[in-house]
Amino acid sequence: ALESSTLPAKLVDCRSTDVERTELFIVEGDSALGTAKLARNSDHQALLPIRGKILNVQKASVTDMLGNAECAAIIQVIGAGSGRTFDLESARYGKVIIMTDADVDGAHIRTLLLTLFFRYMRPLVEAGRVYAAVPPLHRLEVINPGSKANEVIYTCLLYTSPSPRDRTRSRMPS
């Protein structure tokens, strides 16, 4: 079932095929997909939305896991198989980034996805190619008057003081 050469329609793929540069963002739902589309670099960043919580593969059989639409889509998009047949060299992306909401459900979904990767795509984890995004991450575009190119900055809140009154926003280190 997973040998199909066509990728899931919900995948928003990147243009590059250079595995060293490509990144697959697994995002929680179609609403997150819309926001992620606006902030991604389509040259090397692909997006795959998943619907809700995936199957808990720790408790499920291999047959159930492969029959789950979300698990099957993730395995198919990564393109390296699963279990004993997983081939790291066949992976289509250099990095797989889990991007879930900053709530309890998001943490649960992240845990379920990490379990899927650890149980069925462990070489990807062992190679250090699975990441979890830490929300909130904001994309700012600074308009440069008189120039065609605007500066793009990704930021998050970095608290430098325990007092809310003295907290400052800071750029992420480059």
Residue map of PLM features:
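GHKL-family ATPase ATP-binding module
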Residues: A1-K53, F86-L88, G94-K95
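Alpha-helical scaffold elements adjacent to nucleotide-binding pockets in ATP/GTP-utilizing enzyme cores
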Residues: E70-A73, H108-L116
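Hydrophobic alpha-helical segments, chiefly the membrane-spanning helices
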Residues: R171-P173
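Interdomain boundary/hinge elements
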Residues: R122-E141
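Intrinsically disordered, low-complexity regulatory segments
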Residues: A36-G94, V125, V152-I153
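N-terminal assembly/transducer modules of large multi-domain enzymes
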Residues: M99-H108
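Conserved small/polar residues in nucleotide/adenosyl-binding loops
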Residues: Y159-T168
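Conserved phosphate-handling catalytic cores of large alpha/beta enzymes
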Residues: P136-T155
